[in-house]
């Protein structure tokens, strides 16, 4: 399965069913969160909310399974087993495994398409093996949990940029996904009012090869979508470059003072794909 959800994936606490439909309408896909967004005493109620919204009329779920992701609790926990029992009674087959750390954890989910969320040191180190698993459709990294697992206090410097260890993890997960032909999802941007900072980070994510970015608030969706949507000028430039390549009929040619070869042409093709 090729992961095609995105570019804006919106988290929604699974114990807030009144928000499910709105989240799904505002974003390209909704992530119903059974993990960090739900307090331990409320997790069973959250699972019940997922089941309840399916209804008993036979009309099917209110949420489109092809645009719905369920973030489940870490493997090896009691809540992980309860989450799977809940999902067995639903049509939802795309899950995000929190704190994915090993191949064996992914193999415990044979009936699901999995977004492996690497947010611990072990998860980042084992990302290449995790990404290679057949049921893994995408890889995501998490900054704050990663730094917490290392005993750190913040993933970002005072200027808002990521610390070196977070940048390393971001790149490692992206490269692991790419090496196995899987999609990569960029981490959330926790400073909700800072839409300019979010936009800059989302533009970097798109340019670097992340296929989508996770959001924690509906106000972030439009900024992410805009970052992934090439401008008219970008589309025109990419089209002209590809036209020039066809006219040149050569593997390497010069265009507007630049040397153009295969990788540059693939960059242009990527721009046009994002525009469709």
Describe these PLM feature segments.
Residues 1-276:
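Expand to "…catalyze enediolate/carbanion chemistry for C-C bond making/breaking, isomerization
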